[in-house]
Amino acid sequence: MRFFRSVDIDFIGNRYKFFTISGLLLLLTVGAFIYRGGLNYGIDFTGGILMRISFQNEVGLQDVRIAVEESGINSFELQSSGNLVMIRIKKDLEAQEEFETLIKSSIQLRFPDNPVKIEGIEYIGPTVGEYLSKQAVYAFLFAFLVMIVYVAFRFKSSLWGIVSVVGIIHDIVISLGFVILANKEINITIVAALLTVVGYSINDTIVLFDRIKENLKLLVKEDFVAVINKSINEVLVRTIVTSLTVFIVACSLFFFGGEVMHTFAYIMIIGTVLGVFSTIFVCAPLICEWRIKTNKRLKIAIKQDGVRSK
């Protein structure tokens, strides 16, 4: 901890290097999007079949996954609760009876000593999927709007609110890039994970902005760039330690939380790292870049006015 307190890293001086890293990650996301042919939407957004199957004895999800794959169905999701297993199939709704027979037969062959019973089947139509898609978009738009208004009000400038949302969008887009690279389906779990990442990311950003605001009042004679650098170095320990605790918990869920928590934890691991990166290497440098550009324009305007007055 003493090491972190004594460091004096020139974050702002190296801002273009960090902007380049962000740009490369965004290009990677675009490349993955093109290569995969877009986002791979799950049953929550496309519609399909939801089957609830109960076993006499508890079973492992991996064994159930193998049984479903052996029935010839590849696009599906699994979720379990005790002896009950839910199978979400992204398929044509007209073939529900065929899927029911195939899955039940395959599972019975896989678990001959564990009686299985189909508790129910639900059909999620395209209309429901479209509704959920709209709700997900509304959730993100509402979150962005609230963030802009809150940060702008707190720091008495809309610029700070806009920059904080730019950082959040940066985190979400790149997180989606890693989702695409891993060929994971976009479902409600991923939407929930991304909204959680938004919360952690904006929290880190507000902590840093608060310190910048305090130091701007205390260090009136200091250069703006120096104040930004000093503020980042001062909150560095807090940001790293807080994010590290979230990162460790997310890793625990990823490796030991089972299949249900795997996707959520995957997004949290990536999002936690990106949240720290965007706060320190994107948001703060953007504020500084805006101030530098504004001062340059102001000096040019004053110089031009002086020439005209002569």
Swiss-Prot record:
<keyword id="KW-0472">Membrane</keyword>
<feature type="transmembrane region" description="Helical">
    <location>
        <begin position="135"/>
        <end position="155"/>
    </location>
</feature>
<dbReference type="InterPro" id="IPR022813">
    <property type="entry name" value="SecD/SecF_arch_bac"/>
</dbReference>
<keyword id="KW-1133">Transmembrane helix</keyword>
<dbReference type="InterPro" id="IPR005665">
    <property type="entry name" value="SecF_bac"/>
</dbReference>
<feature type="transmembrane region" description="Helical">
    <location>
        <begin position="162"/>
        <end position="182"/>
    </location>
</feature>
<dbReference type="InterPro" id="IPR022645">
    <property type="entry name" value="SecD/SecF_bac"/>
</dbReference>
<dbReference type="GO" id="GO:0015450">
    <property type="term" value="F:protein-transporting ATPase activity"/>
</dbReference>
<keyword id="KW-0653">Protein transport</keyword>
<feature type="transmembrane region" description="Helical">
    <location>
        <begin position="188"/>
        <end position="208"/>
    </location>
</feature>
<keyword id="KW-0812">Transmembrane</keyword>
<keyword id="KW-0813">Transport</keyword>
<feature type="transmembrane region" description="Helical">
    <location>
        <begin position="240"/>
        <end position="260"/>
    </location>
</feature>
<dbReference type="GO" id="GO:0043952">
    <property type="term" value="P:protein transport by the Sec complex"/>
</dbReference>
<comment type="function">
    <text>Part of the Sec protein translocase complex. Interacts with the SecYEG preprotein conducting channel. SecDF uses the proton motive force (PMF) to complete protein translocation after the ATP-dependent function of SecA.</text>
</comment>
<dbReference type="Pfam" id="PF07549">
    <property type="entry name" value="Sec_GG"/>
</dbReference>
<feature type="transmembrane region" description="Helical">
    <location>
        <begin position="18"/>
        <end position="38"/>
    </location>
</feature>
<dbReference type="InterPro" id="IPR048634">
    <property type="entry name" value="SecD_SecF_C"/>
</dbReference>
<dbReference type="GO" id="GO:0065002">
    <property type="term" value="P:intracellular protein transmembrane transport"/>
</dbReference>
<dbReference type="InterPro" id="IPR022646">
    <property type="entry name" value="SecD/SecF_CS"/>
</dbReference>
<dbReference type="InterPro" id="IPR055344">
    <property type="entry name" value="SecD_SecF_C_bact"/>
</dbReference>
<keyword id="KW-0811">Translocation</keyword>
<protein>
    <recommendedName>
        <fullName>Protein translocase subunit SecF</fullName>
    </recommendedName>
</protein>
<comment type="similarity">
    <text>Belongs to the SecD/SecF family. SecF subfamily.</text>
</comment>
<dbReference type="GO" id="GO:0006605">
    <property type="term" value="P:protein targeting"/>
</dbReference>
<keyword id="KW-1003">Cell membrane</keyword>
<comment type="subunit">
    <text>Forms a complex with SecD. Part of the essential Sec protein translocation apparatus which comprises SecA, SecYEG and auxiliary proteins SecDF. Other proteins may also be involved.</text>
</comment>
<keyword id="KW-0997">Cell inner membrane</keyword>
<feature type="transmembrane region" description="Helical">
    <location>
        <begin position="267"/>
        <end position="287"/>
    </location>
</feature>
<dbReference type="Pfam" id="PF02355">
    <property type="entry name" value="SecD_SecF_C"/>
</dbReference>
<dbReference type="GO" id="GO:0005886">
    <property type="term" value="C:plasma membrane"/>
</dbReference>
